[in-house]
Amino acid sequence: MEEPRPSKRLRSMAPNQASGGPPPEPGCCVADPEGSVEADGPAQPAQPAKPIAYVKPFRRQPPARPESPPPAERGRRRGGSRRPGRGRGRRAGPRGDAGQRQGAEGLMAPDVHIQLDHHGEPGHQGEPEITETAAFSLSETGPPPGTVQEGPGPDVAQPELGFQEPPAAPGPQAVDWQPVLTLYPCIGFRALGDSAVLQVIQTPQGTYVQGVPVFLTDIAY
């Protein structure tokens, strides 16, 4: 048979009395270590520590931009050959040939000079003669298109520039050489009460003023 256990109050008082200490005050409760252990229950096992995670450092890099193609080279590159289809080469086709032909015609257009030559005879006025001088480039083998060529072909040597002698007049009045008379514009003025006519003649060498008697001007006109 088991013996009855003393109450918690009696057990708490017993050790104090045995040790000779002062009695506990009334109304004070002393906890029993055994009872506290029984009241708390069995001890729980120790909880493991928190897990440690090892993180590998990662460096973020911006995305690489796509490289743009280099700009197309224009003209002739340094130390290289000219690219095909580019540059200042001669254009092929009818339009390019027509443009070059028009440019050649503009540069090699004939230079026309009109000169009035008067083959004078004593007491007779001849008809003015119109001469045309055409200047062409020596590099051209033929006349430019659209022009009419008169006289010898391109293989014949061109005559040299110089004094041109007029053809001799037919008949007994023919001479070895006849002077060439050139017509210049002339303006005449007659003063009041004067028998002379003041004439102003303009020539390439200058302007001349001379007086001519009235009877000579009447005969001439």
Curated annotation (Swiss-Prot):
Q: Name one Pfam family in it.
A: PRR20
- Entry's Gene Ontology molecular function annotations: identical protein binding
UniProt lists compositionally biased (Low complexity) regions at: 42-53
Listed Basic residues bias regions: 75-93
UniProt-annotated stretches for the region Disordered: 1-103, 137-174
Biased composition annotated in UniProt, kind: Pro residues: 63-72
Q: Give the matching InterPro entries.
A: PRR20
What domain of life does the UniProt record list for this protein's source? Eukaryota
What's this protein's family per the entry?
Answer: Belongs to the PRR20 family.
Name of this protein: Proline-rich protein 20D
